[in-house]
A protein has these predicted regions:
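Membrane-interface micro-motifs in multi-pass membrane enzymes
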Residues: 61, 65, 108-151, 173-174, ...
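Transmembrane alpha-helix segments characteristic
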Residues: 110-118, 199-206, 260-283
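Perimembrane helix-loop-helix junctions
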Residues: 180-205
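Hydrophobic, aromatic-rich transmembrane alpha-helices
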Residues: 90-99, 186-190, 243-265
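Signature aromatic-anchored transmembrane alpha helix within multi-pass, membrane-resident enzymes
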Residues: 157-162, 202-205, 261, 309-332
Length: 480
Protein backbone atom coordinates (compact mmCIF):
# COMPACT_ATOMS: atom_id res chain seq x y z
CA UNK A 1 0.00 0.00 0.00
CA UNK A 2 1.35 3.48 -0.87
CA UNK A 3 2.43 5.34 2.26
CA UNK A 4 0.21 8.30 1.36
CA UNK A 5 -2.86 6.03 1.51
CA UNK A 6 -1.69 4.52 4.80
CA UNK A 7 -1.42 8.02 6.28
CA UNK A 8 -4.97 8.80 5.12
CA UNK A 9 -6.26 5.62 6.77
CA UNK A 10 -4.48 6.57 10.00
CA UNK A 11 -6.12 10.01 10.01
CA UNK A 12 -9.51 8.45 9.27
CA UNK A 13 -9.21 6.02 12.20
CA UNK A 14 -8.31 8.88 14.57
CA UNK A 15 -11.28 10.90 13.30
CA UNK A 16 -13.71 7.99 13.66
CA UNK A 17 -12.54 7.41 17.25
CA UNK A 18 -13.11 11.10 18.03
CA UNK A 19 -16.58 10.93 16.47
CA UNK A 20 -17.57 7.89 18.51
CA UNK A 21 -16.37 9.47 21.74
CA UNK A 22 -18.18 12.75 21.12
CA UNK A 23 -21.37 10.97 20.10
CA UNK A 24 -21.31 9.29 23.52
CA UNK A 25 -20.46 12.47 25.44
CA UNK A 26 -23.39 14.33 27.05
CA UNK A 27 -23.80 18.06 26.61
CA UNK A 28 -22.53 19.89 29.70
CA UNK A 29 -20.89 23.12 30.82
CA UNK A 30 -20.42 25.64 28.01
CA UNK A 31 -22.35 23.41 25.63
CA UNK A 32 -25.48 23.85 27.74
CA UNK A 33 -24.80 27.56 28.16
CA UNK A 34 -24.67 28.08 24.39
CA UNK A 35 -27.60 25.72 23.87
CA UNK A 36 -29.65 28.11 25.98
CA UNK A 37 -29.50 30.69 23.18
CA UNK A 38 -32.04 28.73 21.10
CA UNK A 39 -33.69 26.46 23.67
CA UNK A 40 -34.55 26.31 27.35
CA UNK A 41 -36.13 28.84 29.69
CA UNK A 42 -33.69 31.63 28.75
CA UNK A 43 -33.86 31.19 24.96
CA UNK A 44 -33.79 34.49 23.09
CA UNK A 45 -33.20 33.45 19.47
CA UNK A 46 -35.67 31.86 17.08
CA UNK A 47 -34.56 33.15 13.68
CA UNK A 48 -31.48 33.70 11.52
CA UNK A 49 -31.65 37.43 12.23
CA UNK A 50 -31.74 36.78 15.99
CA UNK A 51 -28.66 34.57 15.61
CA UNK A 52 -26.82 37.39 13.82
CA UNK A 53 -27.74 39.81 16.60
CA UNK A 54 -26.60 37.30 19.20
CA UNK A 55 -23.31 36.95 17.30
CA UNK A 56 -22.84 40.71 17.39
CA UNK A 57 -23.49 40.76 21.14
CA UNK A 58 -21.04 37.89 21.55
CA UNK A 59 -18.38 39.84 19.60
CA UNK A 60 -18.95 42.89 21.79
CA UNK A 61 -19.31 41.30 25.22
CA UNK A 62 -17.82 37.78 25.28
CA UNK A 63 -15.18 37.22 22.60
CA UNK A 64 -14.93 37.80 18.87
CA UNK A 65 -14.37 34.15 17.98
CA UNK A 66 -16.32 33.04 14.96
CA UNK A 67 -15.95 29.47 16.23
CA UNK A 68 -18.28 30.26 19.14
CA UNK A 69 -20.79 32.09 16.97
CA UNK A 70 -21.00 29.22 14.46
CA UNK A 71 -21.19 26.67 17.25
CA UNK A 72 -24.28 28.33 18.72
CA UNK A 73 -26.25 27.71 15.51
CA UNK A 74 -24.87 24.21 14.89
CA UNK A 75 -26.13 23.10 18.30
CA UNK A 76 -29.54 22.89 16.61
CA UNK A 77 -28.29 19.80 14.76
CA UNK A 78 -28.74 16.27 16.12
CA UNK A 79 -25.84 15.35 18.40
CA UNK A 80 -24.71 12.46 16.20
CA UNK A 81 -24.37 14.84 13.26
CA UNK A 82 -22.53 17.39 15.38
CA UNK A 83 -20.17 14.61 16.49
CA UNK A 84 -19.52 13.69 12.85
CA UNK A 85 -18.70 17.32 12.05
CA UNK A 86 -16.26 17.43 14.96
CA UNK A 87 -14.72 14.18 13.73
CA UNK A 88 -14.07 15.93 10.41
CA UNK A 89 -12.43 18.79 12.36
CA UNK A 90 -10.11 16.28 13.97
CA UNK A 91 -9.22 14.82 10.58
CA UNK A 92 -8.54 18.32 9.24
CA UNK A 93 -6.23 19.24 12.12
CA UNK A 94 -4.25 16.01 11.88
CA UNK A 95 -4.11 16.19 8.09
CA UNK A 96 -2.86 19.78 7.98
CA UNK A 97 -0.29 19.15 10.71
CA UNK A 98 1.07 16.13 8.84
CA UNK A 99 1.09 17.96 5.48
CA UNK A 100 2.91 21.02 6.84
CA UNK A 101 5.46 18.71 8.46
CA UNK A 102 6.11 17.19 5.04
CA UNK A 103 5.07 13.73 6.20
CA UNK A 104 2.15 12.94 3.87
CA UNK A 105 4.22 10.24 2.16
CA UNK A 106 6.11 9.06 5.26
CA UNK A 107 3.86 6.74 7.24
CA UNK A 108 6.30 5.99 10.07
CA UNK A 109 6.98 9.64 10.86
CA UNK A 110 3.30 10.56 10.38
CA UNK A 111 2.26 7.80 12.80
CA UNK A 112 4.69 9.05 15.44
CA UNK A 113 3.46 12.64 14.98
CA UNK A 114 -0.16 11.46 15.26
CA UNK A 115 0.76 9.60 18.46
CA UNK A 116 2.38 12.71 19.91
CA UNK A 117 -0.72 14.75 19.09
CA UNK A 118 -2.99 12.12 20.63
CA UNK A 119 -1.05 11.79 23.87
CA UNK A 120 0.70 15.15 24.34
CA UNK A 121 -1.93 17.74 23.42
CA UNK A 122 -4.13 18.82 26.38
CA UNK A 123 -7.19 16.78 25.39
CA UNK A 124 -7.75 16.30 29.13
CA UNK A 125 -8.67 19.99 29.50
CA UNK A 126 -12.37 19.60 28.64
CA UNK A 127 -11.74 18.89 24.96
CA UNK A 128 -14.76 16.59 25.08
CA UNK A 129 -16.87 19.75 25.17
CA UNK A 130 -18.26 20.46 21.72
CA UNK A 131 -17.53 24.13 22.38
CA UNK A 132 -13.84 23.36 22.89
CA UNK A 133 -13.86 21.21 19.75
CA UNK A 134 -14.90 24.27 17.77
CA UNK A 135 -12.61 26.69 19.60
CA UNK A 136 -9.45 24.62 19.45
CA UNK A 137 -9.59 21.59 17.15
CA UNK A 138 -11.62 23.28 14.40
CA UNK A 139 -9.84 26.63 14.75
CA UNK A 140 -6.43 24.98 14.64
CA UNK A 141 -7.23 22.94 11.55
CA UNK A 142 -8.76 25.91 9.72
CA UNK A 143 -5.87 28.27 10.50
CA UNK A 144 -3.31 25.70 9.35
CA UNK A 145 -5.35 25.16 6.19
CA UNK A 146 -5.46 28.92 5.58
CA UNK A 147 -1.70 29.16 6.19
CA UNK A 148 -1.12 26.64 3.40
CA UNK A 149 -3.59 28.30 1.07
CA UNK A 150 -2.19 31.83 1.32
CA UNK A 151 0.96 30.50 -0.34
CA UNK A 152 -0.98 28.64 -3.05
CA UNK A 153 -1.95 30.00 -6.46
CA UNK A 154 -5.72 30.31 -7.00
CA UNK A 155 -7.00 28.66 -10.18
CA UNK A 156 -9.33 31.52 -11.15
CA UNK A 157 -10.82 34.78 -9.93
CA UNK A 158 -13.84 32.88 -8.63
CA UNK A 159 -11.53 30.50 -6.79
CA UNK A 160 -9.66 33.49 -5.35
CA UNK A 161 -12.93 35.05 -4.17
CA UNK A 162 -13.97 31.80 -2.49
CA UNK A 163 -10.58 31.34 -0.80
CA UNK A 164 -10.61 34.97 0.35
CA UNK A 165 -13.96 34.50 2.07
CA UNK A 166 -12.84 31.28 3.77
CA UNK A 167 -9.49 32.79 4.82
CA UNK A 168 -11.36 35.72 6.37
CA UNK A 169 -13.45 33.25 8.37
CA UNK A 170 -10.36 31.23 9.34
CA UNK A 171 -8.68 34.35 10.68
CA UNK A 172 -11.69 35.03 12.91
CA UNK A 173 -11.77 31.57 14.49
CA UNK A 174 -9.43 32.13 17.46
CA UNK A 175 -7.01 34.95 18.22
CA UNK A 176 -4.30 32.69 19.67
CA UNK A 177 -4.28 30.66 16.44
CA UNK A 178 -4.47 33.31 13.71
CA UNK A 179 -2.81 36.42 15.14
CA UNK A 180 0.59 34.75 15.79
CA UNK A 181 0.56 33.43 12.21
CA UNK A 182 -0.15 36.92 10.86
CA UNK A 183 2.74 38.44 12.81
CA UNK A 184 5.10 35.65 11.75
CA UNK A 185 4.10 35.86 8.06
CA UNK A 186 4.53 39.65 8.14
CA UNK A 187 8.02 39.24 9.58
CA UNK A 188 8.83 36.69 6.87
CA UNK A 189 7.74 39.14 4.17
CA UNK A 190 9.90 41.87 5.74
CA UNK A 191 12.89 39.50 5.72
CA UNK A 192 12.35 38.74 2.01
CA UNK A 193 10.86 35.32 2.54
CA UNK A 194 8.38 33.61 0.23
CA UNK A 195 5.59 36.03 -0.57
CA UNK A 196 2.01 34.89 0.13
CA UNK A 197 -0.91 35.80 -2.09
CA UNK A 198 -1.64 39.40 -1.10
CA UNK A 199 -5.42 39.09 -1.29
CA UNK A 200 -5.58 35.86 0.68
CA UNK A 201 -3.17 37.06 3.35
CA UNK A 202 -5.05 40.36 3.65
CA UNK A 203 -8.31 38.44 4.13
CA UNK A 204 -6.79 36.16 6.76
CA UNK A 205 -5.18 39.11 8.57
CA UNK A 206 -8.43 41.08 8.52
CA UNK A 207 -10.26 38.20 10.15
CA UNK A 208 -7.51 37.88 12.73
CA UNK A 209 -7.65 41.57 13.60
CA UNK A 210 -11.44 41.41 13.94
CA UNK A 211 -11.20 38.71 16.60
CA UNK A 212 -7.98 39.80 18.33
CA UNK A 213 -9.13 43.36 18.88
CA UNK A 214 -12.81 42.66 19.45
CA UNK A 215 -14.19 44.41 22.56
CA UNK A 216 -14.99 41.02 24.10
CA UNK A 217 -11.40 39.76 23.77
CA UNK A 218 -9.96 43.02 25.09
CA UNK A 219 -12.22 42.83 28.15
CA UNK A 220 -11.20 39.20 28.73
CA UNK A 221 -7.54 40.17 28.53
CA UNK A 222 -8.02 42.95 31.07
CA UNK A 223 -9.93 40.64 33.41
CA UNK A 224 -7.30 37.88 33.22
CA UNK A 225 -4.68 40.32 34.49
CA UNK A 226 -6.52 40.56 37.82
CA UNK A 227 -6.84 36.79 38.31
CA UNK A 228 -4.40 34.59 40.23
CA UNK A 229 -2.37 32.45 37.76
CA UNK A 230 -2.67 28.67 37.99
CA UNK A 231 1.08 28.42 38.61
CA UNK A 232 4.38 30.28 38.39
CA UNK A 233 5.33 31.59 34.91
CA UNK A 234 7.98 28.89 34.41
CA UNK A 235 5.65 26.06 35.48
CA UNK A 236 2.88 27.47 33.28
CA UNK A 237 5.19 27.19 30.28
CA UNK A 238 6.49 23.75 31.21
CA UNK A 239 3.00 22.35 31.73
CA UNK A 240 1.27 23.95 28.74
CA UNK A 241 3.95 24.85 26.19
CA UNK A 242 6.87 22.43 26.57
CA UNK A 243 7.27 21.83 22.81
CA UNK A 244 6.99 25.56 22.11
CA UNK A 245 9.76 26.14 24.67
CA UNK A 246 12.00 23.78 22.70
CA UNK A 247 11.25 25.78 19.56
CA UNK A 248 12.01 29.02 21.43
CA UNK A 249 15.42 27.62 22.38
CA UNK A 250 15.99 26.72 18.73
CA UNK A 251 15.18 30.29 17.68
CA UNK A 252 17.65 31.64 20.24
CA UNK A 253 20.34 29.31 18.86
CA UNK A 254 19.55 30.53 15.32
CA UNK A 255 19.98 34.13 16.49
CA UNK A 256 23.32 33.34 18.16
CA UNK A 257 24.59 31.60 15.03
CA UNK A 258 23.45 34.43 12.77
CA UNK A 259 20.92 32.24 10.94
CA UNK A 260 17.73 33.82 12.25
CA UNK A 261 17.03 35.90 9.14
CA UNK A 262 17.06 32.96 6.74
CA UNK A 263 15.17 30.74 9.19
CA UNK A 264 12.43 33.31 9.90
CA UNK A 265 11.93 33.81 6.16
CA UNK A 266 11.05 30.12 5.68
CA UNK A 267 7.61 28.56 6.23
CA UNK A 268 9.03 26.42 9.03
CA UNK A 269 10.44 29.58 10.60
CA UNK A 270 7.04 31.27 10.30
CA UNK A 271 5.42 28.44 12.26
CA UNK A 272 8.25 28.51 14.82
CA UNK A 273 7.78 32.22 15.48
CA UNK A 274 3.98 31.80 15.52
CA UNK A 275 4.40 29.04 18.11
CA UNK A 276 6.40 31.30 20.42
CA UNK A 277 3.96 34.21 20.01
CA UNK A 278 1.01 31.93 20.72
CA UNK A 279 2.87 30.62 23.76
CA UNK A 280 3.21 34.19 25.04
CA UNK A 281 -0.51 34.86 24.50
CA UNK A 282 -1.49 31.66 26.29
CA UNK A 283 0.86 32.16 29.23
CA UNK A 284 -0.44 35.71 29.71
CA UNK A 285 -3.82 34.20 30.60
CA UNK A 286 -2.23 32.39 33.55
CA UNK A 287 -4.19 29.22 32.74
CA UNK A 288 -2.71 25.74 32.40
CA UNK A 289 -3.94 23.41 29.67
CA UNK A 290 -5.68 24.20 26.42
CA UNK A 291 -4.21 27.72 26.26
CA UNK A 292 -1.11 26.06 24.82
CA UNK A 293 -3.03 24.14 22.13
CA UNK A 294 -1.95 26.21 19.13
CA UNK A 295 1.59 26.88 20.33
CA UNK A 296 2.13 23.16 20.85
CA UNK A 297 0.64 22.13 17.50
CA UNK A 298 2.75 24.66 15.59
CA UNK A 299 5.80 23.52 17.55
CA UNK A 300 5.14 19.86 16.67
CA UNK A 301 5.18 20.79 12.98
CA UNK A 302 8.52 22.59 13.36
CA UNK A 303 10.12 19.83 15.42
CA UNK A 304 8.96 17.00 13.16
CA UNK A 305 10.11 18.88 10.06
CA UNK A 306 13.64 18.66 11.47
CA UNK A 307 13.58 15.19 13.03
CA UNK A 308 11.59 13.30 10.37
CA UNK A 309 14.72 12.03 8.53
CA UNK A 310 15.81 10.38 11.79
CA UNK A 311 12.50 9.02 13.08
CA UNK A 312 11.53 7.70 9.64
CA UNK A 313 14.05 4.93 10.33
CA UNK A 314 12.19 3.83 13.47
CA UNK A 315 11.90 0.01 13.56
CA UNK A 316 8.52 -1.25 12.35
CA UNK A 317 7.92 -3.11 15.61
CA UNK A 318 8.10 0.16 17.57
CA UNK A 319 5.75 1.87 15.14
CA UNK A 320 3.35 -1.07 15.40
CA UNK A 321 3.49 -0.91 19.21
CA UNK A 322 2.68 2.81 19.10
CA UNK A 323 -0.27 2.25 16.77
CA UNK A 324 -1.56 -0.57 18.99
CA UNK A 325 -1.31 1.70 22.04
CA UNK A 326 -3.18 4.46 20.21
CA UNK A 327 -5.93 2.04 19.22
CA UNK A 328 -6.17 0.62 22.75
CA UNK A 329 -6.36 4.14 24.18
CA UNK A 330 -9.07 5.24 21.74
CA UNK A 331 -11.10 2.08 22.37
CA UNK A 332 -10.85 2.51 26.14
CA UNK A 333 -11.91 6.16 25.92
CA UNK A 334 -14.98 5.35 23.80
CA UNK A 335 -15.99 2.37 25.97
CA UNK A 336 -15.59 4.28 29.24
CA UNK A 337 -17.42 7.33 27.89
CA UNK A 338 -20.36 5.16 26.82
CA UNK A 339 -20.55 3.78 30.37
CA UNK A 340 -20.43 7.26 31.90
CA UNK A 341 -22.97 8.58 29.42
CA UNK A 342 -25.50 5.97 30.57
CA UNK A 343 -25.01 7.10 34.16
CA UNK A 344 -25.32 10.75 33.15
CA UNK A 345 -28.62 10.11 31.38
CA UNK A 346 -29.96 8.45 34.54
CA UNK A 347 -28.73 11.37 36.64
CA UNK A 348 -30.20 14.03 34.33
CA UNK A 349 -33.62 12.36 34.18
CA UNK A 350 -33.70 11.98 37.96
CA UNK A 351 -32.71 15.61 38.42
CA UNK A 352 -35.35 16.83 35.96
CA UNK A 353 -38.00 14.92 37.94
CA UNK A 354 -36.71 16.08 41.34
CA UNK A 355 -38.56 18.84 43.18
CA UNK A 356 -35.62 19.79 45.41
CA UNK A 357 -32.64 19.03 43.15
CA UNK A 358 -31.55 15.96 45.13
CA UNK A 359 -30.53 12.91 43.11
CA UNK A 360 -29.68 9.60 44.76
CA UNK A 361 -27.17 7.42 42.98
CA UNK A 362 -23.80 5.72 43.25
CA UNK A 363 -22.27 7.19 40.13
CA UNK A 364 -18.72 6.62 38.94
CA UNK A 365 -16.23 9.14 40.31
CA UNK A 366 -13.91 10.95 37.93
CA UNK A 367 -10.81 9.42 39.50
CA UNK A 368 -12.14 5.91 38.85
CA UNK A 369 -11.41 6.15 35.13
CA UNK A 370 -8.61 3.86 33.89
CA UNK A 371 -5.28 5.64 33.44
CA UNK A 372 -5.28 4.75 29.74
CA UNK A 373 -8.19 7.18 29.19
CA UNK A 374 -5.95 10.13 30.21
CA UNK A 375 -8.90 12.04 31.71
CA UNK A 376 -10.61 12.44 28.34
CA UNK A 377 -14.01 11.28 29.59
CA UNK A 378 -16.71 12.92 31.71
CA UNK A 379 -19.69 11.60 33.63
CA UNK A 380 -21.88 12.90 36.46
CA UNK A 381 -20.23 16.07 37.85
CA UNK A 382 -18.61 15.98 41.28
CA UNK A 383 -19.91 18.16 44.12
CA UNK A 384 -17.24 20.81 43.47
CA UNK A 385 -18.01 21.05 39.73
CA UNK A 386 -20.17 24.08 40.46
CA UNK A 387 -20.15 25.56 36.97
CA UNK A 388 -21.20 22.29 35.33
CA UNK A 389 -24.01 21.79 37.84
CA UNK A 390 -25.27 25.36 37.48
CA UNK A 391 -25.24 25.13 33.66
CA UNK A 392 -27.50 22.07 33.84
CA UNK A 393 -29.77 23.78 36.36
CA UNK A 394 -30.04 26.83 34.12
CA UNK A 395 -30.84 24.84 30.98
CA UNK A 396 -33.57 22.88 32.79
CA UNK A 397 -35.01 26.01 34.40
CA UNK A 398 -34.12 24.94 37.94
CA UNK A 399 -31.60 27.60 39.00
CA UNK A 400 -33.09 27.69 42.50
CA UNK A 401 -32.43 23.96 42.92
CA UNK A 402 -29.05 23.02 41.41
CA UNK A 403 -28.25 19.29 41.42
CA UNK A 404 -27.18 17.68 44.70
CA UNK A 405 -25.96 14.11 44.21
CA UNK A 406 -26.14 11.89 47.28
CA UNK A 407 -25.15 8.22 47.67
CA UNK A 408 -28.12 5.85 47.55
CA UNK A 409 -27.38 4.80 51.13
CA UNK A 410 -28.48 8.23 52.37
CA UNK A 411 -32.10 7.19 51.80
CA UNK A 412 -31.89 4.72 54.69
CA UNK A 413 -29.14 6.39 56.73
CA UNK A 414 -30.95 9.71 57.15
CA UNK A 415 -34.41 9.29 58.64
CA UNK A 416 -36.87 11.98 59.69
CA UNK A 417 -35.52 12.06 63.25
CA UNK A 418 -31.83 11.69 62.34
CA UNK A 419 -29.35 13.89 64.20
CA UNK A 420 -25.61 13.49 64.57
CA UNK A 421 -23.05 11.92 62.25
CA UNK A 422 -22.96 8.70 60.24
CA UNK A 423 -20.21 7.26 58.06
CA UNK A 424 -21.47 5.57 54.91
CA UNK A 425 -20.05 2.34 53.51
CA UNK A 426 -18.14 4.25 50.82
CA UNK A 427 -16.41 6.42 53.45
CA UNK A 428 -18.53 9.54 52.91
CA UNK A 429 -19.93 11.28 56.00
CA UNK A 430 -23.42 12.63 56.62
CA UNK A 431 -23.72 15.02 59.55
CA UNK A 432 -26.25 17.44 60.95
CA UNK A 433 -23.49 19.84 62.05
CA UNK A 434 -21.29 21.79 59.66
CA UNK A 435 -17.56 21.21 60.40
CA UNK A 436 -16.10 24.16 62.31
CA UNK A 437 -13.16 24.54 59.92
CA UNK A 438 -15.33 24.44 56.78
CA UNK A 439 -14.48 27.33 54.48
CA UNK A 440 -16.68 28.48 51.58
CA UNK A 441 -14.98 27.93 48.22
CA UNK A 442 -17.70 28.48 45.64
CA UNK A 443 -21.45 28.93 45.62
CA UNK A 444 -23.12 26.04 47.40
CA UNK A 445 -20.27 24.11 49.01
CA UNK A 446 -17.44 24.31 51.52
CA UNK A 447 -13.99 22.78 51.93
CA UNK A 448 -12.71 21.01 55.03
CA UNK A 449 -9.99 18.48 55.88
CA UNK A 450 -10.57 14.96 57.14
CA UNK A 451 -7.46 13.11 58.35
CA UNK A 452 -5.32 15.24 56.06
CA UNK A 453 -7.57 14.78 53.01
CA UNK A 454 -9.27 17.78 51.43
CA UNK A 455 -13.02 17.18 51.41
CA UNK A 456 -16.09 18.83 49.95
CA UNK A 457 -18.86 19.80 52.36
CA UNK A 458 -22.17 19.97 50.51
CA UNK A 459 -25.26 21.22 52.35
CA UNK A 460 -28.64 19.65 51.59
CA UNK A 461 -32.10 19.70 53.15
CA UNK A 462 -34.23 16.67 54.05
CA UNK A 463 -37.40 16.60 56.14
CA UNK A 464 -37.05 20.35 56.58
CA UNK A 465 -33.65 19.99 58.28
CA UNK A 466 -30.18 20.93 57.02
CA UNK A 467 -27.52 18.25 56.70
CA UNK A 468 -24.02 18.10 55.25
CA UNK A 469 -22.53 15.54 52.89
CA UNK A 470 -18.75 15.29 53.31
CA UNK A 471 -16.74 13.47 50.62
CA UNK A 472 -13.12 13.52 49.37
CA UNK A 473 -12.53 16.28 46.86
CA UNK A 474 -11.58 15.08 43.38
CA UNK A 475 -9.65 17.71 41.45
CA UNK A 476 -9.86 17.05 37.72
CA UNK A 477 -7.08 18.23 35.41
CA UNK A 478 -8.46 21.38 33.83
CA UNK A 479 -10.38 22.50 36.91
CA UNK A 480 -9.80 26.20 37.54
Amino acid sequence: MPERNAVKILITVVAVAATLQLAATPFFGDDLAYMGVFSGPNAHCDSFFDWLLNGARHWLNVNGRLANILFTALLLLPKWLLACICGCFTALMYSETIKLSGLSKNFTSAAILAGVMLFALPWWDYMMLFDCQFNYVFSCGMCLWAFRKIYAKPKSKLHLAFLSFVCLACGMMHEAASFPLCIAVSLSIFLSGEKPNKVLFASFATGSLLVTFSPGIIMRALESGSKTPDDTPLMLLLKSDSAALIVAVGIIIAVIRGKFRSFAASKTGVLAIASVISMAIGSASGIIGRTGWFAQTYAFIVIFTFISPTISRTPKIITAALLATMLFHATAVVAWQRKLSGEYDTFEKAYAASSDGIVYGDFTKDNAAPIITLNKTRGVPDADDTYLLLCLAGQLGKKDFPPIVLPSEVKTAVTENFSGTVTLSNGDIITSTKPKDAKPLETGFFITHCSGTECVVQPFTLYGKKYYHISPRILDPGDR
